[in-house]
Amino acid sequence: MKRLWLVLVIFCFGKSQTTTVNMGGGEMVLIPGGTFEMGRPDGKSGYDNFPVHLVKIDSFYMDKFEITVGEFKQFLNETGYDFDWGLWEIFFVSPLDDHPMVHVNWYEATAFAEWTGKRLPTEAEWEYAARGELKGKRYPWGNIITKNDANFHKYWKDDDEYGQSHSVKNNGKDKWKYSTAPVGSFEPNRYGLYDMAGNVAEWCQDWYQHDYYKVSPMDNPKGPETGIEKVSRGGHWYSWHKGLRVYNRGGNPPDVKWFQDVQGFRCALDVK
């Protein structure tokens, strides 16, 4: 297992003071515990992110960035882990070491996390961290999304009172039309986390269950005991803008790779 080591740095993002530590070879952010409303505020019965419910989260650490190709290569080189590179998928979508690793199934992401002494975040931890102390907002920064905010595919014309409209891919900072962007290419949220919307979707610990919010406990929920798919959050470089919303849920089979040119991950760690 990779040795954990810690260097403490304090930053300020917006109104939040952020504590960053270097652990397991990568930067992590201390996410202070608290209570939040999880789910879609305008959701309806039958939606997988309905009903909105109160959730209490203990403090934890979360990776500042998505795990990169370079970091995953180091894991493979040091452990000899048997990994299928997926021919063109990784190199076409994430061509350089500073891009997020893709084509990783849930078990491979878990193996990497365990090697670093960490774990995957729970779904509740992920949404709490993505919101970055903002209440009732759609994205980690607010209710409006532009090409200066994240790496994603496109808008649709049929949106809502916020006036989102169609946009070509190359308007704004997002210049990556059919690939990931280097991690940290866009502004962080208030916790100092980068790419919590777009770039790559991120694995969570939990099994996915469509109606789990109806039975979820309040304190540190960890998802159902069993399932067929694992939770994937955050949207990705080929998502339309609604897929990037902090409350948007999804699930994918944990052991297959056919969809995973858009799938990555980041790690979490308990506060001890």
Predicted segments with their positions:
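Sec-dependent N-terminal signal peptides
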Residues: L4-C12
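Bacterial Sec-dependent signal peptides at the C-terminal "C-region" and cleavage site
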Residues: F11-T19
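Short, P/G- and charge-enriched loop/turn segments at secondary-structure junctions
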Residues: Q17-T18, G43-V52, K169, G250-V256
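A short glycine-rich, aromatic-capped structural motif
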Residues: V21-G86, V104-Y107, G198
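Functional-site microenvironments in short loops/helix caps that host divalent-cation chemistry
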Residues: E37, P41-D42, D82, L87-P253, ...
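Non-catalytic surface loops within mature trypsin-like serine protease
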Residues: R40, S59, T68, N143, ...
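Short, structured beta-strand segments at or near domain termini in extracellular proteins/domains
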Residues: F259-K272
